[in-house]
Amino acid sequence: LKWGRSGVATAWAGYQRTTGTRAALLGRDLRRYEDYVAHHREENEREYVIPRWVPIKSLIFEETCDGMKTYHLGTTGMNERAVLYLHGGTYISQISSLHWLFADKLCRDTGAEVCVPIYPLAPAHDHDEAYSLLVDLYEGMVNRYGADKITIVGDSSGGGLAAGIVETFGHYDLPQPAQLVLVSPMLDISMRN
């Protein structure tokens, strides 16, 4: 076995160095950082639509509850299990095409319904808004499937968000999901480690 950074991670780090994205994210270049945040604030206030060129093979439908759009990916039959998928994006970027491909593959490989919420993002919204909407979404999933048939998956900042919301379930008398899968979770939001 070979341990180390994947080719994608190495390429992404190179891209960040070349474009100054990491410096902007860390606030080292204040003007670029402010531009980056302003761009995402404006982008996130627009209604989200899945790009037409993303080749999703699963059946898909959308619903809006309490102002949060949620996409549901499913197979042809009745899904007996569900996945709540929280995408990454440093808490300010909308779901990317790579996230969609991952969610689609997850649905097709597991046969589970994959719920993909377009949750409120910074800087226009805070974690309390996202937590409240996601807890309500999870409660609806528990009522439909039962907690023992639900997996919560989060990657990067979505992994940090997933870890955070499951900690709050006890306050709402909600059962824990059967599984919590964190893919490279962003647990240190100070970005100093």
Question: Residue ranges of each PLM-predicted region?
Answer:
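A glycine/proline-hinged amphipathic helix-loop "lid/cap" segment
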Residues: 1-75
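Alpha/beta-hydrolase superfamily serine-hydrolase fold, recognizing
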Residues: 62-71, 77-193
